[in-house]
Amino acid sequence: MNNIHNHKILILDFGSQYTQLIARRIREIGVYCELWAWDVTEKQIREFNPTGIILSGGPESTTETNSPHAPEYVFKAGVPVLGICYGMQTMAMQLGGLTEASEQREFGYAAVELQHADQLFAKLNDDLTASQPKLDVWMSHGDKVTRLPAGFQTTAVTPTCPIAAMSDEKRRFYGVQFHPEVTHTKSGLALLTNFVENICGCARSWTPENIIEDAVAKIKQKVGNDQVILGLSGGVDSSVTALLLHRAIGKNLHCVFVDNGLLRLNEGDQVMEMFGDKFGLNIIRVNAEERFLEALKGIDEPEAKRKIIGKVFIDIFDDEAKKLTDVKWLAQGTIYPDVIESAASKTGKAHVIKSHHNVGGLPDYMKLGLVEPLRELFKDEVRKIGLTLGLPAEMLNRHPFPGPGLGVRVLGEIKKEYCDLLRNADAIFIEELYKSGWYYKVSQAFTVFLPVKSVGVMGDGRKYDWVVSLRAVETIDFMTAHWAHLPYELLGKISNRIINEVNGISRVVYDVSGKPPATIEWE
């Protein structure tokens, strides 16, 4: 079996908004990496035993006292080191060079001219017409290195940055003032590949097939012949977790699928068909619509609704767990970003490790061990593994759906009538997006039920019925979003279908709010 952790890169985080991108690019190349706060100890680095180290960018200035710096051991470990932006500046300072605040800050696109072809820049050139090789890169810095440390040479320049990259080939230390991890840097992935493969000598063993093989072996080793329970929602993370566990322990996995009446149209049946019939998983389906609706009666405050939905789910999950006498383990779909918690960089910890539980607040007496086979994976890696395990692409690439489901898409009090109307209207919206080729062009699309009535005309009669709002957004990271400019003809078709086919809805509106100031979900 391939050891997927045999070669690994350690990324020390100085607080850059792009740091997770570095990790995702390294994984994309096929090499395992981990993301740690910059102030780790020598002991921790030795225990991790990295094949190479990357120092990330960050918002601080190396010219300030008490600015973050790499542990001294980084430069004594005998492994290649790549400093990116702030990482290059702290490398220069710590090894005897000099940095200064720049009169001209560089933000955005820049063309760097390569001066010396070292291993990092081997075979890279974005401008074949120029006399010197050039790279189109993305800059984002105020400070710059003004004096090289001993043993270093300048490898790239820009008109405003005379040391845009540097290297000490003997010690295998490299620094770049730009960000190779962002897609705006055209040859960024090739540069990182040069570092990881050619300089560090890492093999590409981090592949979906190898990850699956490793996860299955670890699950078998950890749980043996014990019984495991998993809350299956039909979402990407719990679905992939279920298939990995099923492959490892078969019928010893007990999936609890709680149908809370707040799911999309026919979703409960689809989950049972997919995981029960197609994959042969052992699934306990709990039809709990009445229990959830009863608990939500009269509640219209969004946070209160979320808490009730969470509590009722845990109560039901707990009831089912008690019925299974031999269960020793709880499986969860925790993924790597859940494990990394962002904190203010001023604390000196840009990212700290937190204990994260998807099923929050499980009773203490459920003394179960935890199995988290996706704990090392980013979301895109989870999707690739799901595809390799046989899950359909349409399911893996579905738009995000909130944990409380329609509980936060029906504004105000939740009633069965409202949920049914919303389910049917939303199904039409999504169907038309698929048919028109717009579903994958937008990042998220859904329908919201508004607890207001509006006058409409049907035939010769007037009707006084409910209003729904359509919402479709485009975003890269879900932190900010633009409303999607869907064609008027498409919006008209969707509106006509909903009003004609869903009895009880008289008006359809389209939400044209961006984030900020609005959030993506209404509640």
Swiss-Prot record:
<feature type="binding site">
    <location>
        <begin position="233"/>
        <end position="239"/>
    </location>
    <ligand>
        <name>ATP</name>
    </ligand>
</feature>
<dbReference type="GO" id="GO:0003921">
    <property type="term" value="F:GMP synthase activity"/>
</dbReference>
<keyword id="KW-0658">Purine biosynthesis</keyword>
<feature type="domain" description="Glutamine amidotransferase type-1">
    <location>
        <begin position="8"/>
        <end position="205"/>
    </location>
</feature>
<keyword id="KW-0547">Nucleotide-binding</keyword>
<dbReference type="InterPro" id="IPR025777">
    <property type="entry name" value="GMPS_ATP_PPase_dom"/>
</dbReference>
<dbReference type="GO" id="GO:0005524">
    <property type="term" value="F:ATP binding"/>
</dbReference>
<keyword id="KW-0315">Glutamine amidotransferase</keyword>
<protein>
    <recommendedName>
        <fullName>GMP synthase [glutamine-hydrolyzing]</fullName>
        <ecNumber>6.3.5.2</ecNumber>
    </recommendedName>
</protein>
<comment type="function">
    <text>Catalyzes the synthesis of GMP from XMP.</text>
</comment>
<dbReference type="InterPro" id="IPR022955">
    <property type="entry name" value="GMP_synthase"/>
</dbReference>
<keyword id="KW-0067">ATP-binding</keyword>
<feature type="active site">
    <location>
        <position position="179"/>
    </location>
</feature>
<feature type="active site">
    <location>
        <position position="181"/>
    </location>
</feature>
<dbReference type="InterPro" id="IPR029062">
    <property type="entry name" value="Class_I_gatase-like"/>
</dbReference>
<dbReference type="InterPro" id="IPR014729">
    <property type="entry name" value="Rossmann-like_a/b/a_fold"/>
</dbReference>
<feature type="domain" description="GMPS ATP-PPase">
    <location>
        <begin position="206"/>
        <end position="398"/>
    </location>
</feature>
<dbReference type="GO" id="GO:0005829">
    <property type="term" value="C:cytosol"/>
</dbReference>
<dbReference type="InterPro" id="IPR001674">
    <property type="entry name" value="GMP_synth_C"/>
</dbReference>
<comment type="pathway">
    <text>Purine metabolism; GMP biosynthesis; GMP from XMP (L-Gln route): step 1/1.</text>
</comment>
<dbReference type="Pfam" id="PF00958">
    <property type="entry name" value="GMP_synt_C"/>
</dbReference>
<keyword id="KW-0436">Ligase</keyword>
<dbReference type="InterPro" id="IPR004739">
    <property type="entry name" value="GMP_synth_GATase"/>
</dbReference>
<dbReference type="Pfam" id="PF00117">
    <property type="entry name" value="GATase"/>
</dbReference>
<keyword id="KW-0332">GMP biosynthesis</keyword>
<dbReference type="Pfam" id="PF02540">
    <property type="entry name" value="NAD_synthase"/>
</dbReference>
<dbReference type="InterPro" id="IPR017926">
    <property type="entry name" value="GATASE"/>
</dbReference>
<comment type="subunit">
    <text>Homodimer.</text>
</comment>
<dbReference type="InterPro" id="IPR022310">
    <property type="entry name" value="NAD/GMP_synthase"/>
</dbReference>
<feature type="active site" description="Nucleophile">
    <location>
        <position position="85"/>
    </location>
</feature>
